[in-house]
């Protein structure tokens, strides 16, 4: 096959003049003289299904074995391939860029702009597989060609997003931007942060059609640290929340993914926890399964974010202050916060001084506890214990070992051990009155440190969290039940309305049918009177008959249908004779027995209608119901 051969059932490969003419540098010994012929021949084979696999393997082999001098002619052959060729050819040309990036890496740095322009040229392709190959090629270039700054790849893609209006190109550029940011080793977050306002304008623009793909790119930028400042998050988070209610399910899914990345990647996420959690809670029951799962994952990520209020409620682990006695400064601060969290379950109390039982303060503390627990009849023993305690208190610097022990306990707590909750027992007036009589320490309060087992506190916090989760689940269940109740009530209203409409329709139909029957009787009577067959004062059509039929005022023109007038036929002799005989019998009977019963009148009317039935077998006009 020649160089300018044609694809089977497809236009030929077109090359620009610059690519068809061989430069002196391309004729170096390291470049085969038939490189272009081999590449174009393989591209021609790609259009044939039988030779597709063989041509793809050969092109990959050529791309892997290229030298520095052969990069330029090879890229020219790929770049100048006509866009009217078959889809496998276009896809393979882009895939070759991925092969080049993976095998040659930074050697392609001088040709990176050419490769990016080749990718952008293929982004208009209507075939989604070609655009996906462009995204893969962009990711490989961003990951393996690292000597050039990341802006050399991202900037052309962002400019393409802003300037172009083709929907396929917008989708492809957004996918390539997201792939390049995810694959880059140094995505230059500062440059991405500067480009976010432009992307935000595109998201708000009605003319931009690839909003779902662009939201995916925004999520990648957030992961790379491009939204790490409060001004950016102040406008970005409301935009993402707005897209949660979009009509496009892909946009809803991408917005939920971006919100989840804000929760995991940004340090300022705690300031937006309430807003984002509320928005995701209201949209978590989406009709599309994949969107619903994405929103639930994002909601769980936001629930794990700790707010500033929750951080302030954590146990204080600061060092001691100069204005307090030894280790008990932390006792006073932490007890006011955490003592309310203790449950009524039994606890294992282990005093801090239990580690050094020979300390004198331990005797003082034990004596004080025994003094409080003794009954009143042992006042003498209590006095001795208090004297011993007061004498021990005056012995000197006995708080030093206690402080050391407490500091060791605090170091253990700060190093990851269980939290120690300390409690202060203040009995100023009682201790002053009892200790002053013996000349003891007039401190005004007795501070007794006690350590609590960390399991009880942990269990208490777990119970609080479980109760919060249970309350949230109960509120959701109540909302669901209320929604179901509203739906059932609306369905019941619709059913009642339908039943009422059906009943009124049936009644209307019955009235119309009865009206038609009365109209038919009236017409038959009028016809008989007009022909002179029945006297006007006969009981069959008289106004004083007990079985008088309603007049024609009940009729409406909508009951009738105009038909073509037919010629009036004469009645046969037999029909006229039968009619005359019936009329005479009816007239004689009505004149002789006018005061008969209602039953007799109804029978006469039936006889009259039977007589008229024979006459009206061929009516002059058609009556339609």
UniProtKB/Swiss-Prot annotation:
Matching InterPro entries: ARM-like, ARM-type_fold, HEAT_type_2, TORTIFOLIA1/SINE1-2
Modified residues (Phosphoserine): 475
Region (Disordered): 1-34, 391-466, 582-625
Any GO CC annotation of this UniProt entry: microtubule
Ranges of the HEAT repeats in the UniProt entry: 69-106, 110-147, 149-186, 190-227, 230-268
Database matches in Pfam families: TOR1L1_N (PF24714)
Gene3D superfamilies, sorted: Leucine-rich Repeat Variant (1.25.10.10)
Molecular-function annotations in GO: microtubule binding
Biased composition (Low complexity): 12-29
Keyword Phosphoprotein: yes
Residue ranges with Polar residues bias: 612-625
Ranges of Basic and acidic residues composition bias in the record: 404-413, 420-434, 455-466
Domain of life: Eukaryota
Keyword DNA-binding (UniProt): no
Keywords assigned by UniProt, alphabetized: Phosphoprotein, Repeat
Protein's name according to its UniProt entry: TORTIFOLIA1-like protein 4
């Amino acid at each position: 096959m020649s160089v300018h051969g044609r694809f089977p059932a497809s236009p030929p490969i077109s090359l620009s003049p610059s690519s068809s003419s061989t430069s002196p540098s391309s004729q170096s010994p390291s470049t085969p003289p038939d490189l272009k012929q081999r590449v174009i021949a393989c591209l021609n084979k790609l259009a044939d299904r039988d030779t597709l696999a063989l041509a793809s393997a050969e092109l990959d082999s050529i791309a892997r074995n290229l030298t520095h001098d052969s990069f330029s002619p090879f890229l020219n052959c790929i770049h100048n391939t006509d866009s009217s060729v078959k889809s496998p050819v276009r896809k393979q040309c882009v895939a070759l860029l991925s092969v080049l990036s993976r095998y040659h890496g930074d050697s392609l740095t001088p040709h990176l702009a050419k490769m990016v322009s080749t990718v952008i040229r293929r982004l208009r392709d209507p075939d989604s597989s070609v655009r996906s190959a462009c995204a893969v090629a962009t990711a490989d270039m961003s990951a393996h060609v690292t000597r050039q700054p990341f802006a050399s790849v991202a900037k052309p893609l962002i400019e393409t997003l802003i300037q172009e209006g083709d929907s396929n190109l917008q989708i492809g550029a957004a996918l390539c931007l997201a792939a390049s940011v995810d694959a880059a080793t140094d995505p230059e977050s500062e440059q991405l942060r500067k480009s976010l306002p432009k992307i935000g304008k595109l998201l708000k623009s009605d003319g931009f059609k690839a909003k779902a793909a662009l939201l995916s790119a925004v999520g990648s930028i957030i992961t790379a640290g491009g939204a790490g400042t409060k001004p950016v998050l102040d406008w970005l988070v409301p935009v993402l929340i707005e897209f949660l209610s979009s009509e496009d399910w892909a946009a809803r899914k991408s917005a939920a993914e971006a919100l989840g990345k804000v929760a995991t990647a940004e340090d300022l996420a705690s300031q937006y926890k309430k807003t984002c959690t509320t928005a995701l809670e209201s949209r978590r029951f989406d009709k599309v399964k994949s969107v619903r799962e994405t929103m639930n994952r994002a909601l769980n990520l936001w629930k794990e974010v700790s707010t500033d209020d929750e951080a302030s409620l954590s146990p204080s682990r600061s060092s001691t202050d100069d204005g307090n006695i030894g280790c008990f400064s932390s006792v006073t601060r932490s007890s006011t916060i955490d003592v309310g969290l203790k449950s009524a379950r039994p606890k294992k109390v282990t005093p801090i001084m239990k580690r050094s039982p020979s300390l004198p303060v331990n005797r003082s503390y034990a004596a004080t506890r025994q003094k409080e627990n003794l009954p009143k009849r042992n006042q003498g023993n209590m006095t001795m214990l208090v004297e011993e305690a007061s004498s021990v208190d005056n012995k000197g610097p006995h708080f030093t070992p206690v402080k050391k022990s407490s500091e060791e306990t605090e170091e253990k707590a700060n190093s990851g051990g269980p939290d120690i909750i300390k409690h202060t027992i203040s009995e100023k007036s009682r201790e002053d009155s009892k200790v002053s009589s013996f000349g003891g320490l007039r401190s005004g309060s007795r501070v007794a440190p006690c350590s609590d087992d960390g399991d009880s506190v942990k269990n208490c916090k777990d119970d609080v969290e479980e109760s919060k989760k249970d309350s949230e689940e109960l509120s959701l269940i109540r909302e669901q039940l209320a929604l179901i109740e509203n739906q059932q009530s609306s369905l019941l209203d619709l059913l009642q309305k339908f039943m009422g409409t059906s009943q009124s329709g049936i009644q209307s139909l019955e009235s119309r049918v009865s009206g038609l029957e009365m109209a038919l009787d009236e017409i038959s009577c009028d016809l008989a009177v007009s022909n002179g067959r029945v006297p006007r004062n006969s009981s069959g059509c008289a106004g004083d008959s007990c079985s008088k039929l309603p007049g024609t005022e009940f009729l409406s023109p909508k009951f009738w249908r105009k038909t073509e007038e037919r010629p009036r036929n004469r009645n046969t002799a037999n029909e006229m004779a039968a009619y005359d005989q019936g009329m005479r019998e009816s007239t004689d009977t009505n004149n002789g027995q006018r005061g008969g019963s209602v039953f007799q009148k109804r029978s006469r009317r039936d006889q009259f209608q039977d007589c008229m039935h024979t006459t009206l077998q061929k009516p002059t006009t058609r009556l339609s119901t």
